[in-house]
């Protein structure tokens, strides 16, 4: 009777984790043999403990088999899903890069076309090889020049009587002259006159 009580209390003191997850380095017999002199005296207690351990191991393995089997199958399908999702994400990334490159090419092409049409409108010198920023600065200067021309009363009457092509040529010539005056007025380098 006393042995039964000892066995009951011993089994109660083990936590669920101790029963389900045994120490991988120690065997159940080694744990049982190290429990003291009472374990040597009562072989039925050791058998009950081993049964309990075996039951907990088998139930844990059957639980793992039932849920783990699904998780292994699910793990494989999960791995396949991860592989396919990685492949799909890589393909999506490649497609996004290709589309971004196409959009950038189209944007650059339209920008270059706009600058070339702007260079045709702005009166330039034959020796001019303007960058984009220089083209924009020259366009701003030309707009200011046109504004000044429109403000003067003399040119308004002259431009109104002439055709638009001739007016454009006169404005272009006047703008070129003003550019040269500005160039020389700002203290151009010694190679400046050769530039024009």
From Swiss-Prot:
Q: Name one GO biological process term.
A: negative regulation of cell differentiation
Q: In which tissues is it expressed?
A: In late gastrula embryos, expressed in the presumptive first pair of somites and the middorsal wall of the primitive gut. Expression is then up-regulated in the lateral wall of the somites and the notochord. At the late neurula stage, also expressed in the anterior wall of the primitive gut and in the evaginating lateral diverticula. In the earliest larval stage, expression is restricted to both ends of the body. In 36 hour larvae, only faint expression is detected in the notochordal and paraxial mesoderm of the caudal region.
Q: Which PROSITE patterns match?
A: BHLH
Any one GO MF annotation of this record: DNA-binding transcription factor activity, RNA polymerase II-specific
Tell me which GO cellular component terms the UniProt record holds.
Answer: nucleus
Domain bHLH: start-end pairs: 95-146
Q: Where in the cell is it found?
A: Nucleus
Compositional bias of kind Basic and acidic residues: 14-24
Name of the featured protein: Twist-related protein
